[in-house]
């Protein structure tokens, strides 16, 4: 597995950009523009359907895949791997949690829920949610979920040796649906609900870890000709999943409400990231643009930082009479390049590169000397 796998970098980049697009294709409350006509919702929801093929689940699988590839090159013990992942993920997570706890108050006051947000920030229950669930901002849930998933990486290596175990993703997604159908009505209104739901999510998302490891196993064992022969059937299945996603989005366009009770949409949404990973694996032998590898290192920072500028856009445009299409274009054209600029600047600053995964945590000097610890 020596060398750079540009197809993986391309997926990382697509996943990072798609998260920006995903969040701009909803209104400031995270809803599908319910106050406008279906005709005005059409373009935003079409864009969202395409972008939502690369969910955060794709990021999770890429992270597992990269970890397993790194371990195949440089084996380490379990404790060393966990410490390394804690430094890489949880230290930036702590920084951005504190940042967004304060920064989020700006949007909260602008949209009239400042008192409620302030009450959350000054309560221990609020900080428990911030640190354990990542609910300080709508995108921060990804990091604690990923860290919890990576704790199971020794199990995933079984699928690297026996790729058929990748099908466990289907089993675990079925378990997720069944468990949530019990947990939500049983704990509705309880402060424990989000914690139990997150536990169910982490445990059942191990299926994505098995899927990622299976992809690595297939890549290692197959020839280019074999992977090319798989492309047609996998693409056909992917097209079917996309059709189910599109049909569910028709309902969203018509009603102005998200669809949560369509089983076909559930399976299409959660299996599409697996399909994308498999399709790109089958095309891994192609000559992918090398610039993707250079730019993909900023994907993590793009994911972490884009709400900074999206909040500014939403505040500036909150009283606008623009159509949803104009709004999302303006928000994206502002948010994406400004976030990229910020991440690039942080990456070039030794004291800030660690916050976006582009450098180590800066050494700390104790006492009068220059000894680094």
Positions of the model-derived regions?
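Alpha-helical transmembrane segments and their immediate juxtamembrane cytosolic regions
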Residues: 1-373
């Amino acid at each position: 597995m020596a060398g750079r796998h540009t197809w993986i970098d391309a997926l990382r980049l697509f996943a990072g950009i798609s998260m920006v697009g995903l969040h701009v294709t909803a209104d400031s409350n995270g809803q599908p523009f319910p106050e406008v006509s279906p005709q005005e919702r059409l373009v935003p929801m079409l864009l969202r359907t395409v972008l939502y093929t690369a969910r955060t689940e794709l990021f999770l699988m890429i992270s597992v895949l990269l970890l397993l590839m790194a371990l195949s090159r440089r084996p380490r013990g379990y404790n060393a791997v966990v410490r390394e992942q804690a430094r890489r993920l949880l230290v930036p997570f702590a920084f951005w949690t504190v940042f967004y706890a304060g920064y989020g108050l700006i949007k909260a006051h602008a949209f009239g829920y400042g008192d409620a947000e302030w009450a959350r920030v000054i309560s221990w229950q609020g900080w428990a949610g911030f640190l354990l669930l990542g609910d300080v901002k709508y995108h921060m849930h990804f990091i604690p979920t990923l860290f919890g998933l990576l704790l199971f990486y020794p199990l995933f290596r079984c699928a690297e040796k026996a790729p058929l175990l990748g099908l466990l993703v289907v089993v675990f997604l079925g378990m997720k649906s069944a468990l949530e159908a019990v947990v939500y009505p049983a704990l509705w209104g309880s402060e424990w609900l989000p914690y139990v739901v997150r536990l169910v999510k982490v445990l059942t998302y191990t299926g994505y870890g098995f899927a990622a490891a299976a992809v690595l196993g297939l890549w290692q064992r197959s020839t280019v000709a074999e992977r090319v022969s798989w492309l047609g059937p996998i693409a056909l299945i992917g097209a079917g999943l996309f059709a189910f996603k599109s049909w569910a989005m028709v309902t969203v366009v018509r009603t102005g409400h998200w669809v949560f009770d369509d089983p076909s949409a559930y399976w299409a949404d959660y299996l599409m990231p697996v399909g994308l990973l498999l399709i790109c694996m089958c095309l891994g032998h192609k000559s992918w643009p090398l610039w993707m590898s250079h730019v993909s290192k900023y994907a993590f920072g793009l994911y972490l930082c884009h709400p900074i500028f999206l909040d500014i856009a939403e505040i500036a445009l909150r009283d606008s009479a623009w159509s949803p299409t104009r709004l999302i274009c303006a928000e994206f054209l502002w948010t994406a390049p400004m976030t990229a600029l910020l991440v690039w600047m942080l990456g070039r600053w030794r004291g800030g590169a660690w916050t976006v995964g582009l450098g180590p945590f800066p050494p700390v000097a104790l006492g009068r000397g220059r000894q680094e610890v």
